[in-house]
């Protein structure tokens, strides 16, 4: 049977396959214990159009900890800003098989407040 990681990766593959059928720009989110990452990826070719993470130097100055909801909210607002600068309004949310809860939810809500539609 599956262990926890294999089940998450399976969910991620299924989601990415559905997004690929739509041919939509996707907002891909990844998290670790200490950091959170967000990338806007083009539908064809997998090219990164915009990105933000808690590892960015300008973000690190403002945050004491990169692995909490406050950091996720900051990254959500920043990725929405950078997406608008790249001319992107509509995205598909790819949560990488992670549960829509906690830091993932905080990032998504902040991105929506920043003007991204998904």
Swiss-Prot record:
One CC-aspect GO term: cytosolic large ribosomal subunit
InterPro entries named in the record: Ribosomal_uL18_bac-type (IPR004389), Ribosomal_uL18_bac/euk (IPR005484)
Keyword Nucleus annotated: no
UniProt keyword rRNA-binding present: yes
GO MF annotations, alphabetized: 5S rRNA binding; structural constituent of ribosome
Keywords: Ribonucleoprotein, Ribosomal protein, RNA-binding, rRNA-binding
Gene Ontology BP, a term: translation
Family membership: Belongs to the universal ribosomal protein uL18 family.
Function: This is one of the proteins that bind and probably mediate the attachment of the 5S RNA into the large ribosomal subunit, where it forms part of the central protuberance.
Quaternary state and interactors: Part of the 50S ribosomal subunit; part of the 5S rRNA/L5/L18/L25 subcomplex. Contacts the 5S and 23S rRNAs.
Cited NCBIfam families: L18_bact
Name assigned to this protein: Large ribosomal subunit protein uL18
Gene name of the encoded protein: rplR
